[in-house]
C-alpha cells in the first residue's frame, strides 16, 4: 500500500486528481490540504505518508516553501510537484527546494501512478516539457541570473544522457533499456 497526501487549493483540480488515483487500489489517500502550511501540519500528525503530491501556487504557504520545510524535517517523505506551471523559475526553485519529481496536472492517470511508484523507488520523474526546460536550464546555467556557483550542478555525461531521454518523454524503464542500465 502507498500512503499519499495531496496539497491542492483548487477543488476541481483536487477532485480530478482524486478521481485519477482512485483507479489504483494500492493507493490510500490519507490527507488533503488546501495550502503548504496544512500539508506540513498533516505530516506532523501522521508519520505514515510515503508521498505528497504538491501544487505550487497556494494561499498561506506555497508548495515550494512547504517542500523545502518538509524535506528538512521529513526527508523520507517523497514530494511530487504536480502543477500547471512549467516556467523556469518554478522548475528551478522546486528542484532546489527538494522536489523529487515534477509533473503537470494534465498528466494521465497511469503516468501519475508510474510517477508515484518510480519516485518511491528512488527515481525522479519529469513531464517531457519540464525535462526539456530543466536540460536547457543546466546547459545555460552560467547565463541565468538566479544561479550562484554552488547552485550549478555538474552532471556527468551519463546524467545528461538520462535527462535528454526524459526530455523525449521516455519512461524510466525505457531509459534503462535504451542506455543499458540495470
What are these regions (language model features)?
Residues 8:
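Conserved acidic carboxylate
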Residues 35-38, 62-65:
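Acidic catalytic/metal-coordinating carboxylates
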Residues 47-53:
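Active-site beta3 strand of CheY-like receiver
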Residues 55, 83:
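Active-site residues of response regulator receiver
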Residues 58:
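Receiver (REC) domain active-site loop signature in two-component systems and cognate sites
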Residues 136-165:
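Regulatory hinge/linker segments at domain boundaries
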Residues 169-182:
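Recognition helix of helix-turn-helix DNA-binding domains
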Amino acid at each position: 500500500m502507498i500512503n499519499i497526501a495531496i496539497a491542492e487549493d483548487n477543488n476541481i483540480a483536487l477532485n480530478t486528481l482524486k478521481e485519477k488515483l482512485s483507479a489504483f487500489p494500492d493507493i490510500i489517500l490519507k490527507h488533503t490540504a488546501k495550502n503548504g502550511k496544512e500539508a506540513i501540519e498533516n505530516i506532523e500528525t501522521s508519520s505514515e505518508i510515503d508521498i505528497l503530491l504538491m501544487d505550487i501556487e497556494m494561499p498561506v504557504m506555497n508548495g515550494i516553501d512547504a517542500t523545502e520545510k518538509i524535506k528538512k524535517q521529513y526527508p523520507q517523505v517523497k514530494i511530487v510537484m504536480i502543477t500547471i506551471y512549467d516556467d523556469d523559475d518554478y522548475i528551478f526553485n522546486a528542484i532546489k527546494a527538494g522536489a523529487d519529481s515534477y509533473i503537470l496536472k494534465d498528466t494521465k492517470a497511469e503516468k501519475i501512478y508510474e510517477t508515484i511508484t518510480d519516485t518511491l523507488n528512488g527515481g525522479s520523474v519529469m513531464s517531457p516539457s519540464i525535462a526539456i526546460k530543466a536540460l536547457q536550464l543546466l546547459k545555460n546555467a552560467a547565463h541565468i541570473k538566479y544561479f550562484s556557483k554552488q547552485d550549478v550542478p555538474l552532471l556527468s555525461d551519463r546524467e545528461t544522457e538520462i535527462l535528454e531521454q526524459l526530455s523525449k518523454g521516455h519512461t524510466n524503464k525505457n531509459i534503462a533499456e535504451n542506455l543499458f542500465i540495470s
